[in-house]
């Protein structure tokens, strides 16, 4: 029998995962969490399902409902995955440290990795991301590279090494961009209208 279609739901009291046609029943191995949760999402590949609660982030194997990993970050308001689910990205509300400096509130984690007993997961990279709009990184289809939009440019990184900018695409006034989902690795940038300049969308290979 083919794998059933699946959907998840979030209410004020908890989260559930349901196998739809042809079985229409709750996912057998999933223990429904209770209490407040801020957000939830599937990975684009459908392999993982994650949600954020007051205690942290939990990731399960969507096919069986078993917990894959937990992230020790309790203030998450947005969740995202890379295309193949290798990385999970979290966004927390902007805040400052004792010196008034902005804390790095966008964090990238490996979804599944072996962790020694007594150790916690370590972030792959982190950034200051003030806006909740367009907060997430964008990845190439093979997850080799990822990118984010900053003032007047799009910065590209090797996905496993986020401490060093791999290359930059300079675009004065850019506010948004998109990486093509296929193998040609084109990038489109959006530059909004300003004074006499009209909206501009540029497609760059």
PLM features: what roles do these ranges have?
Residues 9, 51, 90, 148, ...:
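Residue position within the beta-strands of beta-propeller blades
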Residues 12-17, 56-58, 96-107, 152-157, ...:
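Structural motif
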Residues 24-31, 66-70, 122-128, 163-168:
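A short beta-strand motif characteristic of beta-propeller blades
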Residues 1-4, 38-48, 78-87, 136-145, ...:
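Blade-terminus and WD-like Trp-Asp/Gly-His loop motifs, strongest in beta-propeller folds
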Residues 33-37, 73-77, 129-134, 169-175:
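Short coil/turn segments at the loop-to-beta-strand junctions that recur within blades
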